Amino acid sequence: MPNAVPSATVVKTPLFRPSFWSITVFVLVASGIGIRAYRDLSRPDAWDYWKDQYIAPSMTVSLIDKTYLAGRDQGRRTLAVSGTIGPAASRLLRDRVDEAKLTAGDLILLSSPGGELNQGAIMGEIIRSHGLATAVGTADASGRIKPAYCASACVLVYAGGKPRFGVLGSALGVHRFVTEKPMKDPVADAQRVTGAVLGYMTKMGVSSSVVEAMSETREIRWLAPKDALAMNLITDPLSKP
């Protein structure tokens, strides 16, 4: 009887066998990410920025296909911006403007009590660089704009628009900007902030009288439409002030 043919031995080869170098590279990459995250969070106010950007944004930005500023308006694409201007607000606005592919003449619709001064100025610069218009208000389901208010740092965002529409019933509020952080020389710091705001407003084509109005009070001063128009803060009123 012929000898039985021995069955072949099947050797299972692992799909992947990590090498020393692959493990080393992984550890280095992981540690690099961890170190970078630690460095980011160890900076002053870094946690506030991360929280505002990734965990609980203080501001919402929504795309509206068309809003209508007045009866004869043909409608324009709009980003509705509402809420407090937090540490990551300018990053959020920049991302949303890019995602929406807004073009010159499209609208940024604002409704905000204010917030971070530097973020408000950066947001205004973003708006100006894209040639976007601004208005204060909220939009209903039909795209009709309803009155709202824009105060403090929000006014800097509004100033970035070209043109800046004045919606009947909406309000612009200004006050003296102060910092909550302890300063060695509060007077010098106040002068520095005032100078920076004046330079920004001048660049945006707003009269220096708006900064004078800001300097008069720490409480919100709501500008009458005729005053906002005289300051060139409002450039295109939708009704006679």
Regions found by a protein language model. Give the residues of each.
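A short, well-ordered alpha-helical element
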Residues: I85-D106
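Ser/Thr/Pro/Gly-rich low-complexity linker/stalk segments immediately outside membranes or between
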Residues: D40-L63
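Charged, glycine-interspersed solvent-exposed loop segments at helix/strand-loop junctions
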Residues: G173-P241
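Hydrophobic membrane-insertion alpha-helices, especially the h-region
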Residues: R17-R39
